[in-house]
């Protein structure tokens, strides 16, 4: 009797061939401390990931409490240091409670899976993060996507929805590939008119926007406007993990029903300690945020004089939309040879024809770093013209 054919090998080969043909084959850059580079690709907006105070807090907590939490939060992994961090995050965002998750992706999946099912209707901005799209899909919710930041389109879709269906409106706070900011107040008003809850993922706003770094939601929009607030700890705060903030009933519900929370080992205590230190720095050193916004404005001004195709972003995320995948890769490779790391973003992360360099600014970028980036971009322009 002959062996059965292996359908998986052919399936994987076909997918790889198609991704190569589309010009979207992804590769992981392995970075070395032997060959230093200037990072304009990461999300370390306040420069805290390399701050020695965070590293020391993490090391001290690891020595005292162990390298890992050893169990999930609901078994024996929820330590006093996690409890302290949740209280601080609730305080920062002006919510009664917060709940830690291991990653931002897991937080969004956990919320949507716990709140939604096939009876639920979810309305999402078309440019929402993949974790929000995937979460609604995995929950089995009836999902519709409205045009980017188009409140009239959202209003039209909500008006057509059955009145008896639990409804959730979902949006990024700061859109990670464009750098523009959701109109949170207007979204909240639209959701309330239709009896819907609003969920905002403020991954790129927390630590950057708001009067005290509380994000584009934070204390400016209370839990009645935004019942579900998600934030991440691995971007402006420089550590790792994520959280959901809201009222008592929401957090209790997530503890009971959010499977990515229930069935995951708690984050290492050292990570929680580093995040607590980051929150101290955020509170005591507001000049970091001021410096970040100065750097973003400096880049926009100088890039504008070069005639680079900027978007309307006023955040540290500054995309240069080049359109063509091959062109984006040429520019990124040329910049890499000059010791400059930028994001080369192609479909399916962004729509086809909108490939871009995703440039992110940090409070720690000095004048020399910014000058090197601008000179590198000018060189790309000159070489292309020639």
Swiss-Prot record:
One annotated GO biological process: biotin biosynthetic process
Enzyme class: transferase
Its EC number(s): 2.3.1.47
Required cofactor(s): pyridoxal 5'-phosphate
Binding-site residues for substrate, renumbered to this chain: 26, 129, 349
Catalyzed reactions: 6-carboxyhexanoyl-[ACP] + L-alanine + H(+) = (8S)-8-amino-7-oxononanoate + holo-[ACP] + CO2
Metabolic or biological pathway, per its Swiss-Prot or TrEMBL entry: Cofactor biosynthesis; biotin biosynthesis
Family note: Belongs to the class-II pyridoxal-phosphate-dependent aminotransferase family. BioF subfamily.
Oligomer status and interactors: Homodimer.
Cited function: Catalyzes the decarboxylative condensation of pimeloyl-[acyl-carrier protein] and L-alanine to produce 8-amino-7-oxononanoate (AON), [acyl-carrier protein], and carbon dioxide.
Protein name: 8-amino-7-oxononanoate synthase
Record lineage: Bacteria, Pseudomonadati, Pseudomonadota, Gammaproteobacteria, Oceanospirillales
